[in-house]
Amino acid sequence: MTTTDAPGHTLTTDPRPHFRSAARTACATVEAVSVDQLHLPTPCTDFDVRALLGHLVAVFRRVTSVAAGVPAVGHAPLVTDVPDDGWGAAARAAVRQLEQAWADPDVLRREMVLPFGTLPGAAALASYTGEVLTHTWDLATATGQIPAWDDEVVAGALVAVRRKLPTAERPPGIPFADAVPVPDDAPAIDRLVAWQGRDPHWRPVA
């Protein structure tokens, strides 16, 4: 079953397949990062590559916790207890636990407390799909990777985040800057990360 949000875009009522796809792309990107890249800057200006890896794993763990009814507010933004060569395994393990936590369809109907408001589980997971994709783009761009984005998943995430985030003057608790203008015909991933406050043309300083 699907619901139409805008012409040409649909949102599935069960966001778990899209989240799984985003998580797989994230894990593949994490596993391709080498130890000598951990110090590099990223488009997410608060984090270098090592910190961004810690944040991604923390996001996966947070999404697991909210499924169990734990408010997302107050969770540590970074995981710091992973060895430099262990990020791929840590990400995979976190995603396995997350998928188990969300296996019951009833979780999609539960109210969940997020930093930016209280949402049903389905809407919360759709929003987190956009966050995972954006941070995967951050990581890939910082380390010279070009992931195989699933345009349907990216477009669905863009619909979800546009529902939740205004273009500018974003409220407290939103971890993204104001939207960056991009052409309407830009690639789906560019439109998503731009809405999340990223410059799609960002590249590391040579």
Describe every region a protein language model picked out.
Residues 2-25, 32-45, 62-93, 97, ...:
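Structured surface interface patches that mediate subunit assembly and partner/cofactor docking
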Residues 55-56:
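Glycine-rich loop at the start of a catalytic domain that most often binds anionic cofactors/ligands
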Residues 52:
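Extended, alpha-helix-rich binding/interface surfaces that flank or overlap catalytic cores
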